[in-house]
Amino acid sequence: MDLHNIREDYSKQELSQANCHADPIQQFEQWLEEAITAKANEPTAMNVATVLDGKPTSRIVLLKEVNPNGFVFFTNYQSRKGQAIEQNPYVALTFFWAELERSVRIEGRIEKISAEQSDNYFASRPYTSRVGAWASNQSQVLSSKSELVAKAALIAAKHPLHVPRPPHWGGYIVLPERIEFWQGRPSRLHDRICYRLVEGAWHKERLSP
């Protein structure tokens, strides 16, 4: 399959160091809001990269909160990503908003949020999603799809109204140490503005594309 001629030339916007916020979290919130306004497809979807036994792996997860401390998502703690995080508590996140020709890369340490925070979010989820969190042994081999459906039915019968949060399911927060904003530009002369956390303060610099 020859893919040599598949390419795009980016020209929608530019990114200057002077116009970026001093705080990268604020800059991210601005870009995320613009992605939502532009009706970007799945604007909160992000690639979460982890390392397990020295081997990288990645998957798409939905961002559920951004606050001054970092970026929050929820998952099964016993999943492959959960095992990787337990072994190596450093991850990388990547957002890509094709409609705006933009990308954001985030690197940092990850830790669990409080049980209370996880309880509150879990209670806000649709009933079927709460049932699914119990039914799925995430990342484990299934003999068939019917096995999963049957298990979900048993959980629903056991908890027809209130579904408690599984102890193996909850939230993580990524505490950023490096955040890079990428804006596509013509002739591959892209804009890259990088923030690095140095002794508690953010340092902003332009990188070569």
UniProtKB/Swiss-Prot annotation:
UniProt xrefs under PANTHER family: PYRIDOXINE-5'-PHOSPHATE OXIDASE, PYRIDOXINE-5-PHOSPHATE OXIDASE
Pfam families named in the record: PNP_phzG_C, PNPOx_N
Protein name from the UniProt record: Pyridoxine/pyridoxamine 5'-phosphate oxidase
Top EC class for this record: oxidoreductase
Subunit structure: Homodimer.
Role this protein plays: Catalyzes the oxidation of either pyridoxine 5'-phosphate (PNP) or pyridoxamine 5'-phosphate (PMP) into pyridoxal 5'-phosphate (PLP).
Cofactor info, note text: Binds 1 FMN per subunit.
Required cofactor(s): FMN
Binding site for substrate: R7, E8, D9, Y10, K64, Y121, R125, S129, R188, L189, H190
The protein's Enzyme Commission number: 1.4.3.5
Assigned protein family: Belongs to the pyridoxamine 5'-phosphate oxidase family.
Keywords: Flavoprotein, FMN, Oxidoreductase, Pyridoxine biosynthesis
Gene this chain is encoded by: pdxH
